[in-house]
Amino acid sequence: FCKKGIEEANRISKEKAKMTEIGSMKYSLWGPEKSEQSLVIRFGRVCESMIKEQIRDTEGFSLLPSGVQRLSGMKKKKDVDLLFLDIEKKMIYYRELKTNIELDTEKLPATSDKVKLLSKHLEKTYPDCTLDFGILCLSVFDQKNLTQNKMKSKIRQFESSGVKITFANDIFKTLSLTITEQEYYKFWRQIGKILRS
């Protein structure tokens, strides 16, 4: 998992970086410089592919179709971030991936509604399986790492709406992948240094 992340960070750092542009406060303050926001968004997509690759490589699990799907019995289409099956347990895992759970007031209910809507669709699509759904926040190793009341409040808001938040360590346990908290945060710091180079 970590090796793939380092490889991808090196690849991204060698590509032409998007620069801050006139109209942004960063540009006004410091002029054109490498857009860290763009790098974070790009690496967020890499995280999604890293998790999917890990699931493909883990015996007993099967990656299911993700991406934009038409919801059963509706004209709506929604994007499914991560969907996989524990073959032995007949457990479907659906996760909306968020690298930043500090969502603004409007996005939190919309994200919660999306997860619940998709979970109903998936229950109809996979009636012979148990569904485990929620949000996966890969920027945090474990919920105990969150000390800010603001973050804890966001988690309570999601959970009170019926949507659980899981973290990197949760998916690592599910996939029997051994990565310590120290290794995980060291990995992210390495990625950050590479992307800023």
Tell what function each PLM region has.
Residues F1, K14, M151-S197:
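Non-catalytic C-terminal interaction segments of nucleic acid-processing enzymes
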Residues F1-E59:
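Interdomain/boundary linker segments immediately adjacent to catalytic/signaling cores
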Residues E36-V40, V68-S72, K78-F84, L118-E123:
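Short secondary-structure capping micro-motifs at structural edges
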Residues I55, V80-I101:
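Conserved catalytic cores of phosphodiester-cleaving nucleases, focusing on short active-site segments
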Residues K75, I87-M91, P127:
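Short, solvent-exposed loop/turn segments that connect beta-strands within catalytic domains
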